[in-house]
């Protein structure tokens, strides 16, 4: 079933934007973590952990947030705002791998490797180092304007010499890694990653003015669009521009994509630490898109920004399925979304309105494809061809699968769900993943494209 659905999805033409970067990856071990703690002293690290810095301005901020992530075993991303710290990172770590990062870049490479009919990727910054991170596939294109016309080139032929490059440093950690923090011995409970995301003035999220008039043509050409990277917008810039300016432009982009035909747009949401900015992104963009994807921490952040602080706190503290379902219902109604997809370590969930053209069984198939693709990626580190989905098909569902289904049925009984289609599936969980980077993006891509493929088959696209 999964294979047939992927086959249908591969007939689609997709557009993805905006964020790409170079991911410099470090595979952490206990000794490296210990060395960092010893360099600053356990007491200083503990004090800074209590302060919980929201961004990285100096090395101790980094060490404190890293140790916190390792202790909880939760994947986290913290912005690096001090460009001068790049040299400190480069002197302290040897990068094990350099590869494509940023949601739009990861999604573009995935779709190209899965042999989708046509993949258009746009990022406002395309330096040579960045362009070389794209897979060399004939179905992958970058839109440029030449002679007043839209021209599609392969990304590695469209780079611009003087564009800035964004480097995100990713620290992959494994469950079972141990180190000492003063008198305490810490064992990492889950595998995950800690991302130090570069948030510098030079990197912006926008569409170049000369390409903007051609967005309706792109929207007409494709079956769907996946937009991401809004977490990279800053509240204020030194040149006088601010988040409001870039969000106004982002709204124009979505409306232009939808001008000639109402192309379905999925927004892949990522954690935004600043509450004010988070609120702006939600209120400006969510009402314009059809589908949103996020993880359970992100839905708590979103609910908190919408004023549902108690519910957000419950999701953060207890992680109960019924709270996530309740939060999802609130979000889909307040933002008038067609589809909300929430992915966690143990389950993936869809929430749609009852009048959605797809049945709950079809929505479930879409999620099955999503978790199978993610399991293939976790097992192999990347997906190089459509055949590799068979790897994910051999990965068992996680051990909490039955418990997840039970709690979901309880939640449905307890909450009013008649006006909704609610679907949940347990994830296929790889015990020792080669990499955890891009798994959420892979889930959202598999889910949204298979959703579109089934809509198309019903004549609803």
From Swiss-Prot:
Keywords assigned: Cytoplasm, Glycolysis, Kinase, Magnesium, Metal-binding, Transferase
Cofactor: Mg(2+)
GO biological process: carbohydrate metabolic process; fructose metabolic process; glycolytic process
Catalytic residues as annotated in Swiss-Prot or TrEMBL: 441
Gene Ontology cellular component terms for the protein in this record: cytoplasm
Keyword Cytoplasm: yes
Protein name, per record: ADP-specific phosphofructokinase
Organism: Thermococcus kodakarensis (strain ATCC BAA-918 / JCM 12380 / KOD1)
Gene label: pfkC
